[in-house]
């Protein structure tokens, strides 16, 4: 069995360099919610050094709230903004001898695209326009995954080690109880259940079916690095290969 481990980088966390030794894919902030041209260059350089797949992490234009504010923008605006961000990272990667492999939206852009078909279409169309060979990463079973498949893109369905799930397989919103899993044992058990058995227990007790092709590790938690190391070790014990 194989699984991809991804982390969001270039967002001001001190643990970026160490996380890049543990993950197989890096989602690099492109300036709209965090980061700038220099952090993008630095993250790309470290990803290449560690053999980690380079990906763009586009967002709504929302640096004030770290890309976590809901926005209702016209699809053409989202298309242009997404194309702008992924095009910038693709060029930075190419200039350093690397290749951008995937795109994963950030924050509220990711969450809204999971449920809003027009928004999902705008993102998928931008990814396809930039490079049809790019992989589109989205929440397992979401509108974004469906949109990517409609454009013929390779998609990668994502699950979260440290997020609570609702009965329909969507994430518990961050402003609601149960959104974040603080207990390491619970997060580890949830991750293994999703990867090995394709299901997750919701906060209301029901089992939701999920397809786990990539697991997101958040680098901003207090014990993020320790958990990442433990997860890698557990995967190795279970014979699960970590690779993009």
UniProtKB/Swiss-Prot annotation:
InterPro entries membership: Glyco_hydro/deAcase_b/a-brl, LamB/YcsF/PxpA-like
Disulfide bond positions: none
EC number: 3.5.2.9
Catalytic activity: 5-oxo-L-proline + ATP + 2 H2O = L-glutamate + ADP + phosphate + H(+)
Keywords: ATP-binding, Hydrolase, Nucleotide-binding
Matches recorded under Gene3D superfamilies: Glycoside hydrolase/deacetylase
GO terms assigned for molecular function: 5-oxoprolinase (ATP-hydrolyzing) activity; ATP binding
EC class of the enzyme, as a word: hydrolase
UniProt record, GO biological process: carbohydrate metabolic process
Function comment: Catalyzes the cleavage of 5-oxoproline to form L-glutamate coupled to the hydrolysis of ATP to ADP and inorganic phosphate.
NCBIfam families: PRK05406.1-1 (NF003812), PRK05406.1-3 (NF003814), PRK05406.1-4 (NF003815), PRK05406.1-5 (NF003816)
Quaternary structure, from the entry: Forms a complex composed of PxpA, PxpB and PxpC.
Family per similarity comment: Belongs to the LamB/PxpA family.
Protein name, entry field: 5-oxoprolinase subunit A
Species this chain originates from: Shigella dysenteriae serotype 1 (strain Sd197)
């Amino acid at each position: 069995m194989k699984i991809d481990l991804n982390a969001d980088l270039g967002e001001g966390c001190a643990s970026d360099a160490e996380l890049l030794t543990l993950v197989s894919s890096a989602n690099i902030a492109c300036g709209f919610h965090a980061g700038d041209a220099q952090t993008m260059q630095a993250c790309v350089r470290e990803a290449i050094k560690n053999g980690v797949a380079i990906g763009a992490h586009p967002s709504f234009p929302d640096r004030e709230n770290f890309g976590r504010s809901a926005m209702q923008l016209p699809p053409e605006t989202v298309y242009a903004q997404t194309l702008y961000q992924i095009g910038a990272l693709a060029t930075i990667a190419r200039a350093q001898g690397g290749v951008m492999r995937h795109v994963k939206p950030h924050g509220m852009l990711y969450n809204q695209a999971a449920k809003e078909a027009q928004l999902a279409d705008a993102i998928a169309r931008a990814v396809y326009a930039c490079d049809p060979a790019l992989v589109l990463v989205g929440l397992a079973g979401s509108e974004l995954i469906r949109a990517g498949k409609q454009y013929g893109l390779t998609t990668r369905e994502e699950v979260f080690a440290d997020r609570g799930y609702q009965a329909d397989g969507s994430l518990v919103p961050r402003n609601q109880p149960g959104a974040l899993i603080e207990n390491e044992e619970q997060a580890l058990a949830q991750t293994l259940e999703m990867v090995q058995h394709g299901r997750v227990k919701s906060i209301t007790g029901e089992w939701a079916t999920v397809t786990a092709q990539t697991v997101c590790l958040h680098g901003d938690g207090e014990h993020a690095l320790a958990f990442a190391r433990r997860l890698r070790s557990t995967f190795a014990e279970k014979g699960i290969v970590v690779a993009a």
